[in-house]
């Protein structure tokens, strides 16, 4: 499990987004993390401590004078036992306290007394988020090395729409997992391709394949978690874009080729795992091809460019990774592919 053995202290502050923290605890525990929950008094008005105790399997702390903690030093014990402190949701009030070193409840005291990294997922009304005072606090926190996860833009509980809502639990978990990954690719730029291509026969038909893009998107996520700046050029797929990744949507092999060529300069790594069609119709019909009795239409096909093998710009990169699918003679095709690419250097 991706978070096996990791110890996370989760701070929950007051706000309607506190209900999302329950799902966050469930997902973190499912990935193997040990989660201890600390709540402000305001947070308990939205979700009860019993909910978090049931989901985490550990007592929940709301009072810095909790007698269950030796010497009444919960802010020390809970921070020293954690690999990270995660505050989600992080209210405007909490961000202000943290930026100015205030500590008047268990969550803010815990954050001030920590000797481990702190991640916070802001959640507030869009006007509160855009307020100059909040933005000054955000700038201070970022300069202090605190990782802010979000916020997102969308519908808010107050009925307004805009930036300020807490990102979803799944997105926070992605960021937490990424935080713990070794940053072997920090400072590197990675360009990737994924998914199928669609080669039009006419306005409604085309040649494609069964690629889902899952492998390419998983590799893109792993590269981002390793610290890389990732650009993903992908064919028509339904995969959600991993956080922090620049996604370029294309349809045909020619479009994918053009996008790769446009962005290849300055890249350190190219990973080509798209299922690019080998051939395309030479002259796609401008109109839908109608049935003509029993006569089947004939298609003239031309070869598509192979991004991995015919571009010196790509072959000159520090690292090139490509993939292909074969149904027989796997070793032979692998050796042949390597020989072809080596001969182009």
Predicted regions and their residues:
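A cross-family phosphate/adenosyl-ligand binding-site feature
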Residues: 1-118, 125-213, 217-309, 313, ...
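Intrinsically disordered, highly charged
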Residues: 310, 340-345
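A metal-dependent hydrolase metal-coordination microenvironment
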Residues: 328
């Amino acid at each position: 499990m991706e978070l096996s053995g990791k110890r996370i202290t989760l701070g929950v502050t007051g706000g309607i987004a506190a209900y999302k923290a329950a799902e966050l605890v469930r997902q973190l525990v499912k990935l193997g993390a040990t989660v201890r929950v600390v709540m402000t008094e305001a947070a308990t008005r939205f979700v009860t401590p019993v909910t978090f105790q049931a989901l985490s399997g550990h007592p929940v702390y709301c009072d810095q004078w909790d007698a269950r903690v030796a010497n009444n030093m919960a802010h020390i014990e809970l921070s020293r036992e954690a690999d990270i402190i995660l505050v989600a949701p992080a209210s405007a009030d909490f961000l202000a306290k943290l930026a100015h070193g205030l500590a008047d409840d268990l969550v803010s005291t815990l954050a001030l007394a920590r000797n481990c990294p702190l991640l916070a997922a802001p959640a507030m009304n869009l006007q509160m988020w855009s307020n100059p005072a909040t933005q000054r606090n955000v700038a201070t926190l970022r300069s202090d090395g605190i990782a802010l996860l979000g916020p997102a833009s969308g519908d808010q509980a107050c009925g307004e729409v805009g930036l300020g809502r807490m990102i979803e639990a799944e997105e926070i978990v992605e960021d937490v997992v990424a935080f713990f990954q070794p940053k072997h690719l920090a400072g590197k730029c990675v360009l990737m391709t994924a998914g199928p291509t669609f080669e039009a026969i006419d306005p409604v038909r085309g040649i494609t394949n069964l690629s889902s893009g899952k492998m390419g998107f998983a590799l893109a996520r792993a590269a981002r978690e390793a610290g890389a700046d990732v650009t993903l050029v992908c064919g028509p797929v339904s995969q959600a874009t991993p956080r922090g990744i620049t996604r370029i949507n294309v349809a045909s092999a020619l479009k994918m080729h053009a996008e790769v060529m446009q962005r290849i300069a300055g890249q350190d790594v190219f990973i080509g795992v798209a299922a690019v069609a080998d051939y395309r119709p030479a002259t796609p019909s401008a109109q839908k091809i109608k049935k003509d009795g029993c006569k089947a239409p004939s298609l003239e096909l031309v070869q598509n460019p192979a991004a991995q093998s015919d571009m010196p710009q790509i072959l000159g990169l520090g690292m090139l990774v490509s993939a292909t699918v074969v149904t027989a003679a796997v070793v032979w095709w692998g050796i042949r592919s390597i020989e072809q690419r080596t001969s182009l250097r």
